[in-house]
Amino acid sequence: MRKASPTVITHNKIPHPFIVKISVLDSLIILLYFIGIIGLGLWISRRQAKGGREFFLAGGTMKWPFIGASLFATNISSQQFVGQAGLAFAVGIIAGGFQLVGAFCFILLSAFFIRTYMGLRLATSPEFFEKRYSGRCRVVVSFINLMMIILGNIAAALYAGALVLTHLLGWDQLPNAEFLYWIAIFLIGIAAGTYTLMGGLKAVIYCDFVQMVVLVLGGALLLYFGIMELGGIESVFVGNVDDAGRSMWSLLRPWEHAFGWLPMLTGGLILGVHGHCTDQDYIQRALSAGSLYHA
């Protein structure tokens, strides 16, 4: 059997157009996945006690495997599969440097920050500012965090998810593609919002566990088929350079580079501490633990 020759990849040059076509069965699987996730969330909502602590912190009953899986699924989502993958194609493997910094910041969260949060019996990160400073400070921090979540995290996740969904379903090739794109955003928002509002944090964490498995297995398959599409593992390493002739696999970039070692150690660490140690998405999951051990 003749072995395919490696494909030389250069910065911002795609080897060939890649068009995905899915069958009716594929579409049915996607639909069943949405229904299954919503159904799981609704089933959990019927089994848990009602109350503020149960809704926001899952009653403080979650165990570390589910918390860890939920944190992983929160950190690795459509934003990374679409956005960060595209960034890595443009600048190289160094785009994953933020995830390395994030892993270190998760250690900081579990070793230092979460002890303080649990000791003060907090439910949200802005509560810390009220206890430390004033209620006015809490309102300001809450407003800033809310705007960042709406305009940053949620907007990016919905955009990336809808981008993939419309492409998979072939909606982006239809005359009314723009309208169908908004439909995709609406469907994703409804699916996530339904089990979140009905089941609270416990439903979110259990659904995150399922989605973590899907993300890991799907990502592994995507990696395999992507490598095969390029002509084999050699194509990933041989001739994979940017416009300046630097290897796209290099983790060491000049300090003046946008992803150089200095920006990663300074700006990356600051962003990582904010995003992983004070962001409500992450600390709320950690605070759902039944004890400091599970947190």
Report the location of each language-model feature.
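Transmembrane helix boundary and interhelical loop/hinge segments in multi-pass membrane proteins
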Residues: 48-52, 121-125, 276-280
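Loop-to-helix junctions at membrane interfaces in multi-pass transport proteins
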Residues: 19-23, 57-66, 83-97, 130, ...
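Extracellular loop-to-transmembrane helix junctions
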Residues: 21-45, 58, 86-122, 126-127, ...
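Membrane-interface "cap" regions at the ends of multi-pass membrane proteins
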Residues: 18-81, 196-199, 215-218
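Structural signature of transmembrane alpha-helix termini at the membrane-water interface
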Residues: 28, 35-46, 107-115, 154-158, ...
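N-terminal amphipathic/basic-hydrophobic helices that include classical n-h-c signal peptides
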Residues: 1-19
